[in-house]
Regions:
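Structural motif
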Residues: 70, 192-205
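ATP-dependent adenylate-handling active sites, centered on carboxylate activation for C-N bond formation
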Residues: 1-185, 220-231
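Short Ser/Thr-interspersed hydrophobic loop/turn segments at strand-loop and sheet-helix junctions
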Residues: 84, 206-221
Length: 231
């Protein structure tokens, strides 16, 4: 987290030690960006490469999660902790910065969608959403379909369907006692009364996604390496 590095550098009397994982030749690699931040704040920076050689160890890592866990970033988190503990015993993670200060790219997407809602009437957006269902299900058209679909609804309803659309949920939850009345949007709109939709989304991610995903991941993988990580 560049924000965490900036704040920690401001209050520290000595240069910070910073660490990151490098994914060579992949679009997920942020090591160059991390290096730029390190240079700007004059930290002692170390990056560790990760590649397919770690795959045979993944089943063992899964066993140490203690529960079903659907975030594959626990794998690089484990190897980062494994390397960091060679130099320090307590580390500060960057967790929480994106949720508190709207750092995720998805927040920009939500803001763009919201600007479209303000610009075009419901009838136009609904018609485009219906037409988008005729597009083929391909990688290049998926984002366009999602954009048109999301703009059929208000911001919070669209946010609550970011993983599965309502038709997809209807297909998955089509039996037994599963509820299909979609109460999430009403809940999210009132997550923090009196603030705008972006603050509600950030707080929802902070109190749910970060707590039930990010902190669990970091806690399991850091303790597996006898490293204490604080957020």
């Amino acid at each position: 987290s560049s924000l965490m590095v900036a704040m920690a550098s401001k209050i520290s009397n000595t240069p910070l030690n910073t660490f990151t994982i490098e994914f060579p030749n992949t679009p997920n690699d942020e090591s160059e960006y991390a290096g730029n931040i390190s240079s700007y704040f004059s930290t002692h920076h170390t990056k560790h490469k990760i590649n397919e050689e770690i795959l045979p160890q993944v089943p063992e890592l899964i066993q140490n999660l203690d529960q079903p866990f659907a975030d594959s970033s626990f794998i690089p988190t484990y190897y980062l902790c494994k390397e960091v503990v060679k130099d320090v015993k307590v580390a500060l993670s960057g967790d929480g910065g994106d949720e508190l200060f709207a750092g995720y790219g998805q927040y920009d997407s939500f803001a763009w969608e919201d600007s479209i809602r303000q610009r075009y009437p419901d009838c136009v957006r609904f018609a485009l959403g219906r037409l988008s269902t005729l597009l083929p299900e391909r990688h290049r058209t998926r984002s366009l379909k999602r954009l048109a679909y999301n703009n059929c609804y208000d911001g919070m309803t669209a946010y609550s369907s970011r993983f599965f659309s309502f038709p997809e949920r209807a297909k998955l939850l089509n039996r037994g006692n599963f509820a299909l009345d979609y109460p999430e949007a009403e809940f999210l709109n009132n997550f923090i009364p009196g603030v705008d939709w972006l603050q509600n989304i950030c707080q929802n991610d902070f109190k749910n996604y970060m707590v039930d995903d990010i902190l669990v991941k970091v806690d399991r993988m850091s303790m597996l390496n006898s490293l204490e990580v604080r957020s």
